[in-house]
């Protein structure tokens, strides 16, 4: 039996933590003939392919390849036998804005190795396909008004075993709508004075939180949130059972009703987190949002729904441009409309109120954004289109070869940006 090793593949931990995936002993290297991996509509892509074995040339390999538009079915397949350890894949072109992906496969000594390379066509012209409801703002104004009747009832438990000489760590909770609570781990600098704060939102899944001690050491309060209304300091097996049971596919729960959809409670609870942070005597009231994937969703949504947010970091946000699939191109995670059976009037109506591209259109706080061309979880067609419609001051970090992960240097840059932005607010 052949084993498959996907270069730049994602384990669940890589997805959550943003870690760079491992490489196999055989490397397939794909290099576009444009140095920036960007093309104009109609230009041809010639992709150089090289193979290495333990860092040395692997000569004469047969490379099978597929070419597709972002997350679409392949429209071209072929193979090339390398001369020495190099060859060229003629990938073709696109006639419209978007991303073109080459998937290359090599079999060697009973193992199968896979790598992807993606290039952009007129990417700055991409815009979301999803429709913004005429009552979008009115809908969310009504939902936010429900928080006015909710007493915060904050609770904090000092986690002495996690505290350091410079940072206190707490397991916290506060009330949300319908009698639910939101939970998280709060890290607070011990020094005198008041500090800015960051709401840090999680990627998809179910699990515990450890608290962001490292960035609290840099002089910011960090509230690392959970979204499921359960404590975030329980035994790991509890989250495993929930993740494989009742929460196995929560992103589509109650998608037929915008006021009962799973993320309704989550979005409102995220906004309520601002009130929690501002209630802390150590907080100076300057708050930013930070997150990737599902966390990028919540970072943008919270910033859009509450003007108290002063800076926003979102990397490869999920839930962008759900209707892409209905319009013949990639849609956002969780890809609910890839399944044609889900394309009902009720589901589409609800999804529009929760589409991140619709929230992005109204952002006001400065934004630092990141996405990768090789991301097959939160497709670049969706994240790039969403970035393009942000009207706020913005900057983007592009990862031409990254998937659903980041390099450490990129994550450091995101944190340096938001800490600098928050500390500069007078």
Task: Show which residues each predicted segment covers.
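N-terminal cap/lid segment of alpha/beta-hydrolase-fold proteins
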Residues: 33-37, 148-192
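Short, aromatic- and glycine-rich surface loops/edge beta-strands on solvent-exposed regions
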Residues: 97-109
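Cap/lid segment of the alpha/beta-hydrolase catalytic domain
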Residues: 207-268, 276, 324-332
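Alpha/beta-hydrolase fold nucleophile elbow
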Residues: 282-292
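C-terminal catalytic histidine-bearing segment of alpha/beta-hydrolase fold enzymes
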Residues: 342, 377, 384-426
């Amino acid at each position: 039996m052949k084993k498959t090793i996907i270069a730049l593949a994602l384990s669940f931990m890589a997805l959550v933590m943003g870690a760079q995936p491992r490489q196999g002993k055989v490397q397939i290297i794909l290099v576009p003939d444009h140095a920036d991996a960007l093309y104009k509509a109609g230009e041809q892509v010639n992709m150089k392919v090289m193979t290495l074995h333990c860092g040395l040339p692997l000569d004469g390999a047969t490379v099978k390849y597929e070419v597709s538009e972002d997350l679409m079915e392949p429209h071209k397949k072929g193979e090339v036998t390398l001369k020495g350890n190099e060859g060229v894949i003629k990938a073709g072109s696109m006639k419209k804005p978007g991303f073109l992906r080459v998937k290359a496969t090599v079999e060697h000594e009973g193992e199968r190795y896979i790598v992807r390379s993606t290039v952009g066509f007129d990417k700055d012209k991409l815009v979301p396909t999803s429709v913004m409801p005429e009552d979008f703002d009115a809908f969310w104004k009504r939902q936010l008004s429900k928080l006015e009747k909710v007493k915060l009832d904050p609770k904090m438990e000092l986690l002495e075993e996690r505290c350091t000489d410079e940072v206190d760590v707490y397991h916290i909770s506060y009330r949300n709508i319908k009698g639910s609570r939101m939970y998280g781990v709060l890290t607070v600098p011990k020094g005198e004075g008041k500090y800015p704060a960051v709401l840090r939102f999680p990627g998809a899944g179910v699990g515990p939180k450890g608290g962001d001690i490292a960035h609290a050491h840099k002089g910011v309060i960090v509230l690392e949130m959970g979204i499921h209304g359960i404590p975030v300091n329980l035994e790991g097996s509890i989250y495993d059972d929930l993740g494989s049971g009742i929460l196995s596919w929560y992103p589509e729960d109650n998608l037929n009703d915008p006021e009962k959809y799973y993320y309704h409670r989550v979005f409102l609870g995220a906004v309520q987190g601002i009130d929690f942070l501002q209630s802390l005597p150590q907080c100076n009231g300057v708050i930013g949002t930070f997150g990737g994937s599902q966390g990028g969703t919540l970072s943008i949504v919270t910033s859009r729904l509450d003007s108290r947010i002063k800076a926003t970091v979102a990397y490869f946000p999920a839930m962008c441009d759900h209707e892409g699939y209905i319009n013949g191109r990639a849609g956002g995670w969780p890809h609910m409309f890839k399944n044609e059976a889900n394309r009902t009037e009720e589901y589409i109506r609800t999804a529009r109120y929760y589409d991140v591209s619709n929230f992005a259109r109204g952002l006001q706080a400065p934004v630092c954004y990141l996405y990768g061309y090789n991301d097959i979880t939160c497709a670049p067609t969706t994240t790039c289109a969403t970035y393009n419609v942000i009207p706020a001051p913005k900057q983007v970090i592009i990862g031409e070869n990254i998937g659903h992960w980041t390099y450490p240097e990129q994550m450091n840059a995101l944190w340096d940006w938001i800490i600098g932005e928050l500390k500069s607010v007078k």
